[in-house]
């Protein structure tokens, strides 16, 4: 059986008119950066990359050494290619401009360089999330405003999960496809075509330690799940929580489920916990392309108009029937 590489897959997408040559090359550069990050993650303590870096990011969170390393790898890999007008990183406060001595292109790249980095020191799966937008026509120079586009305008989105194997999960608007890194070949191999999320599920992911802070619709929904066969749902559910969005969403894309980081009293002043541009939008695009749904509990995530680069929102995504049920509970409240 012929093994198809990521490059071959993207060339076929280009021939079918689904991606431009520049977008294809941009995704390949991101994939090369992912390989480099994967090497650093897998070495761990052997390379002295565990622990905190001694600095805080724009979110006020203590950075891990690998946060800083992954961020630099992505910035440096993508600066020179000529495909980008600018970049934005969850770890950096302002827009990252392309140096003057490099050519500029027609796309904007956003990324969370190392999602779930609090898990690094305990050897649990982490990941990289990315999103691609078009640079608005008619603008001379990219600014923060250039990035203020709803998630439905994304032309590509994806993530890498660094687990027992490294996988790159990608959509360019025509289904969700996963590629597994063959370390001997040095290539991503097409292993999971057209990933789909079932409409129904028996698994849910939420940080139950925050239960006392949840709004009533979420308390009602989770309470019904916990009641199991003897409750209103008439079946048992299992709870899963990795505290790494990439790992939790990857499980949902693989076998279904619902992921929730809802609005609660702890994060109400911030608008939510997760970042719209770096986490919610790309994951929402992937989930919808796989047949699932993604909302804040009140609105479709991909319809939200961002107002700032590091905006936070509630996130509820996964199996369509469950997401619609939670959203209905919010409407009723």
Swiss-Prot record:
Cofactors named for this entry: Mg(2+)
Binding site for Mg(2+) 1: 90, 112, 114
Pathway annotation from the record: Carbohydrate biosynthesis; gluconeogenesis
Binding site for Mg(2+) 2: 112, 115, 279
GO CC annotations on file: cytosol
Alphabetical list of Pfam families matching this protein: FBPase, FBPase_C
InterPro entries per the UniProt record, alphabetical: FBPase_C_dom (IPR044015), FBPase_class-1 (IPR000146), FBPase_N (IPR033391), FBPtase (IPR028343)
Protein name per its UniProtKB record: Fructose-1,6-bisphosphatase class 1
UniProt source species: Azoarcus sp. (strain BH72)
